[in-house]
């Protein structure tokens, strides 16, 4: 029988004990009173601290649609923003040994920030002092504002994806699971739980569940726009709006200028070019124009350039010639002069073209001595060459990628000429030729050896370009609406883990 039921039974039986005689109360000593007061004060202080921290973690930094971004989630995005900016710290004068919330933004930094993709409109409401320092703006504030922009765009797209019923595929989920497993193994190796690791790295309130949700949101926002499809009518209508934004040409370029021939001063600097130097530069350019050699090491490739980009770099005359006069079955080479520089241009391709779907494998040159037991780049290349010579199939190419591709699946969709030119001039030249599924080639570049296996035709460059533009315009429109109503709370953002030190994060 329970104690309460036993007490109840005794009361019901009338067997309740008699009231105990009252005892005289003892007065507590002053020492005990002081000790109790100290305990109460400590409890109040620490209880207040923990309560305050809990309140800070629960604050809403911004809202996108119906989703409220709390401080812990903001920490994940903020940490990524800061991490991606780490390599640019020296350019903008950030001290990598000092917390970001202890350093102020400078006007010198503002000059470089747009180059690194950082919007400086946040600074419009602030004034720098005579020394070029924004006394009221720390790097933490600017980074937090940049993070806000990333979150708004991410969730604007994510919300649309959810509304459309889009979900990540098995490969995307597997990638997220793999990353989570890797992080957990790090935590175990360091003798802590995975939630403890997240809290330590990202801030209080951050845990494994929150990080996984963050990864799902980011991956969804990144992949969903690529699934958007546009009709031929939509693509045609957008192309007609501004053809000049989509029409492109590709060409080889040889550049020379008078300063290339200027003498060297005793201190090692270049002397000012003379008229004789200018004459040599012009003669050199004329020689190349008369006998253009694309294989010349000084010749570069400019692939998929619009008329506006050519005008900006090489002059309006060059742009007009390339788009209106130059032809593969006619005039292909011409010399132009702009700003004391001579440009010899040879047309390589013009108009729309079919892209390729391919499998790609790149074996990077060894930059240092290879560790014992690891294969050298030379051995990898020899093994791949021998295997592909014996078995010239797509399945074997996939096997080579699985063995030597460092985790990449090697799949490339809609490979364009500009991406080929970015690898090497020889890859670009190969891409100009007509290829079919099963065609395979290797290319030795300055950085390593590249293998390409064509799996089929992709979409036309024009369709891809216009579709990307339509997608970007859609993203910008929903982003603008979401940004206007996000209700960004900078005070709440500053309650996040914003005091990171670039040298240790």
Predicted segments, located by residue:
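PPIase-associated folding chaperone regions across multiple families
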Residues: 13-40, 44-57, 64, 193-283, ...
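A short alpha-helix/helix-coil micro-patch that ends at or immediately precedes a cysteine
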Residues: 152-164, 289, 293, 381-392
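N-terminal targeting/tethering segments
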Residues: 53-204
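Short, well-ordered alpha-helical segments enriched in acidic and aromatic residues
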Residues: 296-305, 395-407
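N-terminal targeting leaders characterized by basic, low-complexity, disordered sequences
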Residues: 1-14
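Short helix/turn-capping signatures at newly exposed starts of structured segments
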Residues: 167-170, 293-300
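Secretory-pathway/luminal and periplasmic proteins that interact with or process carbohydrate-rich
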Residues: 182-192, 298-300, 407-413
């Amino acid at each position: 029988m329970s104690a309460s039921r036993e007490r109840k039974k005794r009361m019901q039986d009338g067997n309740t004990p008699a009231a105990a005689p009252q005892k005289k109360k003892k007065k507590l000593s002053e020492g005990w009173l002081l000790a109790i007061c100290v305990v109460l004060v400590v409890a109040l202080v620490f209880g207040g601290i923990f309560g305050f921290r809990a309140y800070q973690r629960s604050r809403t930094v911004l809202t996108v649609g119906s989703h409220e971004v709390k401080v812990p989630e903001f920490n994940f995005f903020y940490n990524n923003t800061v991490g991606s900016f780490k390599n640019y710290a020296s350019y903008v004068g950030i001290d990598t040994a000092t917390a970001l919330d202890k350093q102020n933004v400078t006007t010198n930094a503002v000059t470089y920030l747009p180059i690194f993709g950082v919007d400086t409109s946040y600074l419009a409401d602030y004034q720098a002092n005579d020394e070029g320092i924004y006394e009221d703006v720390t790097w933490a504030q600017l980074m937090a504002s940049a993070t806000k922009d990333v979150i708004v765009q991410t969730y604007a797209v994510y919300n649309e994806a959810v509304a459309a019923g889009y979900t990540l595929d098995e490969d995307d989920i597997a990638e997220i699971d793999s990353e989570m497993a890797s992080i957990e193994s790090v935590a175990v190796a360091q003798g802590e739980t995975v939630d403890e690791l997240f809290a330590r790295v990202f801030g209080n309130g951050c845990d494994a569940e929150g990080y996984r949700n963050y990864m799902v949101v980011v991956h969804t926002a990144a992949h969903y726009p690529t699934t958007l499809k546009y009709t031929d009518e939509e693509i045609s209508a957008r192309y007609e709006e501004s053809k000049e934004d989509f029409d492109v040409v590709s060409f080889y370029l040889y550049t020379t200028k008078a300063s290339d021939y200027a003498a060297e001063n005793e201190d090692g600097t270049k002397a000012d070019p003379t008229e004789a130097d200018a004459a040599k530069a012009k003669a050199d350019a004329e020689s190349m124009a008369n006998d253009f050699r694309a294989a010349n090491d000084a010749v570069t490739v400019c692939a998929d350039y619009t008329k506006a980009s050519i005008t900006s770099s090489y002059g309006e005359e060059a742009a007009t010639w390339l788009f209106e006069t130059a032809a593969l079955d006619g005039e292909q080479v011409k010399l132009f002069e702009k700003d004391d520089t001579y440009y010899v241009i040879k047309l390589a391709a013009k108009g729309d073209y079919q892209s390729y779907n391919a499998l790609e494998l790149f074996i990077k040159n060894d930059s240092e001595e290879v560790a014992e037991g690891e294969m050298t780049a030379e051995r990898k290349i020899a093994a791949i060459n021998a295997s592909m010579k014996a078995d010239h199939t797509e399945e074997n190419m996939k096997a080579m990628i699985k063995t030597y591709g460092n985790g990449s699946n090697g799949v490339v969709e809609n490979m364009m000429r500009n991406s080929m030119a970015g690898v090497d001039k020889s890859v670009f030249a190969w891409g100009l030729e007509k290829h079919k599924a099963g065609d395979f080639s290797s290319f030795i570049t300055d950085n390593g050896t590249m293998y390409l296996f064509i799996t089929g035709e992709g979409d036309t460059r024009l369709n891809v370009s216009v579709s990307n533009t339509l997608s970007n315009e859609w993203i910008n429109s929903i982003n603008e609406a979401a940004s206007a109503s996000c209700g960004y709370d900078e005070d709440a953002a500053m309650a996040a883990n914003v005091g990171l030190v670039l040298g240790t994060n």
